[in-house]
Amino acid sequence: MERDRRLDLGDTHPAVDPTERRLLAYALAVGAASVPSAHGAIVYSGVQNLTLTRTAGSDASLNIDLDGGATDFVLKWYDSTGIIQISSESQNIVVNDGSGLRRLSAGALIGPGSPSSTDVKELANYGVSGTWTSGTWTAGATGYAGVALGSSGSSSTPWGWIQITLPASGTVGSQVVVNSWAYESTGGTSINAGAVPGPGALVSLALGAVGLRARRSRAA
């Protein structure tokens, strides 16, 4: 039977009064809801669920900005062909699989040794009818795109991932979803697809807030 890992303030922190327990719970809730968040060297976007919708008679695009600056990548859906592609901006790169964007599973290593390119890469082709016909990403698939914010040959380049979900059908009105992303703020450092900040920093922050309040109460 799995051990209950919830934080029981009544048992582990007997000196914390009800007001302080409420403060700790509030601090944890605020910390967990903060977007983006950072712990260690990983910077995480939080859940985004940005959408790219196929539009009849015109091409649709979605700008993706990983670090709060300029656009880093552009996801496009061409209605005339049904092709979904990603392009890199400002010499940023994507992890490729030949002419396509490689779909990575959770835990896959992304870093300086990854095959990468600044070229436009295709994810999938749904054709004019909206039926998936080809691509490195299959219909209805969720996966991770490996990316880098800069040249693959630079030791200062941050590596990261973008989680993307493709629709089961590619008819007009269907949507591609960019679920979330993260990157290593330390240049040249590899990251695992799907890696996010751990909760330890949030717990420490909350406990610190409780301790500060307790010290102030005793001093009053």
Regions found by a protein language model. Name each.
Residues 26-27, 57:
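Short amphipathic alpha-helical surface micro-motifs
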Residues 211-220:
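C-terminal membrane-anchoring or membrane-association module
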Residues 11, 27-28, 219:
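A periodicity- and composition-biased signal for non-globular, repetitive helical segments
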